[in-house]
């Protein structure tokens, strides 16, 4: 399973660890993904999402129905 948020599309980024001596080594910045079951009142069922913390905030802000409609329009749910 890819480390990608189903709501926002956030995926791992690459960057550098930088030591005190300014030595650089490659690293990955992973999104803060959570597996969540969210109750959808209109469908009277639970929906499982692999969602980032930013995605959870979007669900709180816009509502699960609007977020699911957007996912279905993109063909992802």
Curated annotation (Swiss-Prot):
Disulfide bonds: none annotated. One of its GO terms (cellular component) is cytosolic large ribosomal subunit. The lineage of its organism: Bacteria, Pseudomonadati, Pseudomonadota, Betaproteobacteria, Burkholderiales. Belongs to the bacterial ribosomal protein bL28 family. Residues 1-25 are annotated as: Disordered. This is Large ribosomal subunit protein bL28. GO terms for molecular function: structural constituent of ribosome. GO terms for biological process: translation. HAMAP family: Ribosomal_bL28. It holds the Pfam family Ribosomal_L28. Gene3D superfamilies: Ribosomal protein L28/L24. NCBIfam families: L28.
């Amino acid at each position: 399973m890819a480390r990608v948020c189903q709501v926002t599309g956030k995926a791992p980024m690459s960057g550098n660890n930088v030591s005190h001596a300014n030595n650089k080594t490659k690293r990955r910045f992973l999104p803060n993904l959570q597996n969540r079951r969210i109750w959808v009142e209109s469908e009277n069922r639970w929906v499982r999402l692999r969602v980032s913390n930013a995605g959870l905030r979007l669900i709180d802000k816009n509502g699960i129905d609007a977020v699911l409609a957007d996912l279905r329009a993109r063909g992802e749910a």
